[in-house]
A protein has these predicted regions:
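Catalytic core of carbohydrate-active enzymes
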Residues: 1-154
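Beta-strand-rich ligand-recognition modules
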Residues: 164-168
């Protein structure tokens, strides 16, 4: 969706006309001029993270370095993203086209407030992630297979199926 549609009244400058929302939590800022090494990106209200560098950003305009072949993508705080990654857990690396299994199922967690439901069609189960800023914890229910939980930011506790797996 276009930024003007997703955030009416916030984005009025044509400078950001190529930015768009991919779902509710990912903001994509394509580089349309290959001669530029820096681009201006507008991030709507809230906290954001760079998908590929995990840098933290506040809302507003930011000048971002953009190397050839890179696509700036930003993730809204409070998002949980599932990835099928290779053995080195590299984002964007080749994992094949298999749809009946996962190489290394990884959930990248950007702590915030909310509930995220994920249905595992391979193992026929639903997994619920609850993220709370009040208690500063992540609670995962229904997980039946080994996964990697990659935390971007800090929380006091991560609890999976009732068992604490991480705490400060």
């Amino acid at each position: 969706r276009s930024m003007a549609y997703s955030f009416p009244g916030q984005v009025t400058n044509d400078k950001y006309q190529y930015q768009y929302m991919f779902g509710d939590s990912l903001l994509v800022a394509p580089v349309v001029d290959v001669t530029k090494k820096m681009i201006d990106v507008y991030l709507p209200e809230g906290n954001w993270y760079g998908l590929f560098d995990n840098e933290s950003y506040k809302s507003g305009t930011h000048t971002i370095e953009c190397l050839m072949g890179e696509l700036p993508v930003f993730v809204r705080k409070g998002t949980i993203l599932p990835f099928n990654l290779n053995e080195k857990l590299e984002l964007g690396a080749y994992v094949g086209n298999e749809t009946e299994s996962y190489k290394n199922l990884t959930f990248r967690i950007y702590p915030g407030e909310g509930v995220y439901l994920w249905y595992d069609y391979v193992n026929n189960c639903e997994v619920e992630f609850t993220s709370s800023t009040d208690s500063n914890e992540i609670i995962v229910r229904g997980l039946k297979i080994p996964v990697t939980l990659e935390l971007i930011g800090k929380v006091d506790t991560i609890r999976v199926n009732g068992e604490d797996i991480c705490g400060t």
